[in-house]
Curated annotation (Swiss-Prot):
Pfam families: IL8 (PF00048)
InterPro entries according to UniProt: Chemokine_b/g/d, Chemokine_IL8-like_dom, Interleukin_8-like_sf
Known role: Chemotactic for resting T-lymphocytes, and eosinophils. Has lower chemotactic activity for neutrophils but none for monocytes and activated lymphocytes. Is a strong suppressor of colony formation by a multipotential hematopoietic progenitor cell line. Binds to CCR3.
Protein name (record): C-C motif chemokine 24
Disulfide bond positions: 33-58, 34-74
Lineage: Eukaryota, Metazoa, Chordata, Craniata, Vertebrata
UniProt key word Disulfide bond: yes
Record keyword Manganese present: no
Native organism: Homo sapiens (Human)
The family this protein is said to belong to: Belongs to the intercrine beta (chemokine CC) family.
Residues linked to a glycan: 115
Superkingdom as given in the UniProt entry: Eukaryota
Amino acid sequence: MAGLMTIVTSLLFLGVCAHHIIPTGSVVIPSPCCMFFVSKRIPENRVVSYQLSSRSTCLKAGVIFTTKKGQQFCGDPKQEWVQRYMKNLDAKQKKASPRARAVAVKGPVQRYPGNQTTC
């Protein structure tokens, strides 16, 4: 009987500890940070997107580029080529916005009488 009481007490203690350890509400996940910048420029046609690393959460402010193959690298935001890549990617994103890419169907819709069903 003493063994059962020890197990129950231990489980209650673990439950109380777990309740205080597990955070409540939303958990803030820091954004990726740049530890170093690439020394060579990556060809612009391989880059598909970018995101900024925050200076408030990272030691260095940087631009994280993603390539077509999913590889990521950091660029120095002070470099001219990094600023140009960001500007060009922003322009591409603007062109690809849903409002600009609305497609209209031209011509009449054809209906085939053989496909209709009657009840």
